Design a protein with these regions (language model features):
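Conserved, well-ordered alpha-helix/loop/beta-strand core segments that scaffold catalytic motifs
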Residues: 1-14
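Alpha-amylase-like alpha-glycosidases and glucanotransferases acting on alpha-linked glucans and related
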Residues: 16-235
Length: 235
């Protein structure tokens, strides 16, 4: 129905799954669990701009060595299944494939975690070999992004993300302002599920930032949501 109306659907898939999911229950060897089925380490991200204690997600981590021994079959089937329902697939926390933040089970914050090397290109080469080289994947490449993460993304020509609010807000990062993009291989977002709505965000900004947006877009700011869409479309 969507295709008949020239609409394409973008799906969204998290890198990690929940401890109480059927994925973990049915595939315990794929995860870092103890003999009772509890995680030995859990997922999260270190302290950053958004949080002084990081984010403790609590998901069980993958046993990547075991995944490799299976030819990454579980991941291949996961991607294959998702692409039967959508045209494109955004993978959340893409940087976790290059290196992931492992927090010892029982910690109350993510502060005491450690960066552990992920499967890197080995995983995506296996997915390409099974599903073809032109797999329609977007990489959520926000947060702590290193040159190694960018290299992994670019090796497979996965589009990254540009969030307009990051370019005009107090982060003041020109990499997210359309006319400063250094690549066309990216997806421009007005915001994400982690952001306020565009109008809500705009109304909370100091007058200096509001004025900057109005001057950048030659607009009065009364329809800033549509202005941001225009910025994206003109990028």
């Amino acid at each position: 129905y969507a295709h008949e109306h020239e609409v394409e659907i973008i799906g969204d898939i998290p890198i990690f799954v929940s401890l109480d999911s059927c994925d973990v229950w049915a595939n315990k060897k794929l995860f870092q669990l103890d003999t009772k089925g509890y995680p030995t380490c859990v997922a999260g991200v270190p302290p950053d701009y958004f949080s002084a204690t990081g984010q403790l997600w609590g998901n069980p981590l993958y046993d990547w060595d075991y995944h490799k021994s299976t030819g990454y079959r579980w991941w291949i089937e996961r991607i294959r299944r998702q692409l039967t329902m959508v045209d494109y697939l955004r993978i959340d926390h893409f940087r976790g494939f290059e290196a992931y933040w492992a927090v010892p089970a029982g910690e109350e914050t993510a502060v005491n975690g450690t960066w552990i090397k992920g499967p890197c290109e080995d995983l995506f080469l296996a997915i390409q070999n099974a599903l073809g080289k032109d797999i329609p994947i977007f990489a959520e490449d926000l947060g702590v992004i290193t040159p190694e993460v960018e290299q992994l993304r670019d090796m497979f020509e996965f589009p990254g993300m540009k969030v307009l609010q990051f370019g005009f807000g107090d982060m003041d990062d020109r990499n997210y302002v359309p006319h400063f993009y250094t690549t066309t291989n990216c997806i421009c977002y007005t915001g994400t599920h982690d952001n306020d709505t565009t109008m809500g965000w705009y109304e909370e900004q100091p007058e200096m930032i509001k004025d900057r947006i109005r001057r950048y877009g030659n607009t009065d700011g009364n329809r800033v949501s549509l202005d941001f869409i225009r910025f994206c479309m003109g990028s």
